Structure formats: structure tokens, C-alpha cells
Amino acid sequence: MSEIRVRFAPSPTGKVHIGNIRAAIYNWLFARHTGGKFLLRVEDTDLERSTPEAIQVLFDCMKWLGLDWDEEVFYQTKNVKRHLEVVDQLLASGHAYKVERTSREGKTGIVTMFRMPKEGTIEFDDIVKGHMAKKAEDIQDFAIVRSDGSPIFHIANVVDDIDQRVTHIIRGDDHVENTFKHICIFRALGAEVPRYAHLSMIVNQQGKPYSKRDGAAFVGEYREQGYLPEALFNYLLLLGWNPGDDREVLTREEMVKLFELEKVHVTAAMFDPKKLAWMNGEYIKKIPAAEFRDMLVRSSASEGSSSGSLGEYAVSLRPDLRDASERIAWWDYLAAQIQVRTKFLTGLGDSIRCFVSDDFPFDEKAVEKRLRKPGVKALLLDLVERFEKVADWSAPALEAVVKELSQGNGMGPWVHPIRVAVSGRGEGIGLFEMLQLLGRETTLARLRKAADTLAME
């Protein structure tokens, strides 16, 4: 069997759509699984949109996702002379002809058309969709060269596939109609027709094509929002394919080993932002503990805290932690609590602000719901008295105090006001772990302040 060669052939516009990058992922995995070549072709014939900046955005997205290509980047604009030479061949063989056409703007010019066969059936076996067929008479002749002399997508695409020796074309099923036309061009040129695999589209929860109206639709947006490239890669792979069991989080090596085009789903794949966020959280959990801890330390610097020093691992609200080993242990404990709960890397500084500074915002809705209720002030002051007597300031000891107060009726009436009083938020890491991290002095001071300024009598 000859070497398998696949290509990703986007038209750079400055933004890379998740549907396009999923096609790149499938092409890349197929090449790696079969030991073939993954080629990158930049279809840059739209000179207004395919700027150097737009092309660089494409490269950056692919490198961020680990989609490395095997040969020099192929630029379609550099092959225009060859495209037109092939058009001349088609004209000479009678497979193309020139005709005068008037544009929508009223301009008249000569357009080169491809002559479709008038009888017979165009057929191919799609690796994903199965046998596909269409009567030749149902497809009209189509343009391959504009009146300005520039080659159109159909001819450029086929010629470049021939020149790059592409054996398999894996692309979206919005190209199925183009494929019938392209097969006719391949045959007219006496070239071998590649194998095709058309991928189902990505849809929203209403079954319509996923677009920016449904949320982030471009790779760059996910990068800015704190998604890990491994998570986005993994999730997009599963939009139309699975390993044959219930595994969802896979290593890159497992993906390469297991990926087969024959297992790609025929039906449309629904994009679920919540599932992607969950997967991102799973990949965040895989970050080495020390690495994640140091991310937190650095992010604390953005909150104006002296805790941002990696050298000292300072803990500005805990002067009682005098030894470096104690401070590192404090950061390790905080990181462990946050790492298992966080879904995104953006906003880490904000999520730990209450641990590194007394200057943190209060969520007004949480204050209204949890603190501005009758009896909350007395509840907080009672807790201050009880917490003052705790000898071992640890999560288990503090939880025992609240459990005793609740008398088996649930700790919610105490837990929620305490959380808002000491952190300004209605959610976060475990409350008693939070109190252990804040330490005795900070916890008691914040409870007193909330009782005096925020809580209702």
C-alpha cells in the first residue's frame, strides 16, 4: 500500500472555527495512526482576507493544539500558474470551454467552465457515510476560472491534491456536492481519485449549525477563556468519534492508537459547552501539583498581594507561618483544594483573592441571601465565641463545632453565612478547609466585621 497522505486546507480569515480544527484533528490522527503524512495547505487565494496576520493566527492555533505538519506549508497562491496550465489541458481535451458571462454588477467577461458528463452516475464509497451516488445529468457545468483569469476553488483544490499526492480527503459534509464535481475533474485529468471521508457537522442543542451565536466558536476564544489545548483537542475528537468504550479522557498516545475513520459517526455531533468545561476541569486536575501551586502563587501577585513571590512563598494573611516549609505547605493545601474544583485557568487570582488579601469584593446577591436575614448577626457572634475556644485550628475541629450547633439538622444555616462573611462569595472550596487556610485571626476578624456591618439583627 502506498503512503497515506492527508491534508488540512483552510482558508485563513483571522479566526479558526472549531469545526475546521476538528477536521484538522481527524486528519492529523489518521496520519499518525497509519504512519502517513499530515500536510498543511493554506488556501490563500482570497487576498483581502488571507493576510499574513490571519495566516499566523492559523499557525498559532495549530501549534497550540499540537497539530504539527510533516512537510513545508503549501500555499495555494504559489501554484496558480500550474492551475491555469491544467485548465488549458482541460480546454484542449474538450472537458472545459469558455463562455461569455455577465456578472451581478453588470460587467461582461469570459469565464471558463468545466463540462460535466451528460450521462452516467458519479459514485464513490465514503469511509464515513458509505456509498454515495448522483446522476451526472443532475449536476450543471460549473466555473473553474473567473473572468479576471483567476482559478476557482474547484480546479485549484483538485490540482493541489494531485500535486501533493493526497490519498485521503477528510473534510466536512458541506463539501459532499463539491466532491461529485471534483471526482469528475480527477477523471478528466486521468488522475487517481482519493478516498473521501465526510464529517458530520457540529450542531447546537437545537440541531442547527453551531455558530458564534451559540457561544465561543473559534479556537482563539477558548484559549483566552482558560481552556487547556489538551482538553479542547480531546473534546473535539469526541464530537463524532469514540474509542469503543466509556472512556472520555484520553492521552494523545491513546488517541493515535485507537483512531479509525471507520468509527467516525454519521450523525451530527451536538456541541455541549458544559461537557467541554467538565473536560477542561479533568485536564486541570492532571497538572502536576507543584506546577499548579506555582500558578496560584503567581496569580496572587496580580491581586496586589506580596504572596506572589515564588522565592519566599509568602502568605500575607498568615504571619504565624514563619518557616518556608510551613508557607509552602499552606500553598500546597490551597492549591489542592482549588485544583480539584476549578474548570478554567483564567480567574485564578480572583478565586484566591480572599486568601491573600483582606481587600476582596462581596457578591451583593450572596450577602442579601445569606447575611441580611433575621438572626444572622447573633449567629455570627456566637460562632466567634465558639471558634475562639478551638485549640486545634483545623478543618475537622471547626466542622465539629458547627455540627454540634446544628444538632443533626444540617449545617446549611451556619455554613452559608460563614462562607459569605469570610470570602464574599456563596461558593468556593470546602468551608472548613477555607477557615483552616485563613487562620484563626483572619477568620474571627472577618466574622466580627460581617456581623457589625452586613448581617441583620
Question: Model regions: which residues?
Answer:
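Residue-level signal for inorganic ion chemistry
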Residues: 27, 58, 90, 114, ...
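Conserved phosphate-binding loops in nucleotide/dinucleotide-binding enzymes
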Residues: 146, 164-175, 203-235, 239-248, ...
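Short alpha-helical scaffolding segments that buttress acidic/His motifs in well-ordered protein cores
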Residues: 235-236, 280, 335-342, 349-352, ...
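N-terminal Rossmann-like or analogous alpha/beta NTP/dinucleotide-binding catalytic cores
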Residues: 1-101, 106-108, 137, 177-191, ...
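Small-residue-rich helix-loop
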Residues: 289-300, 313, 317-406
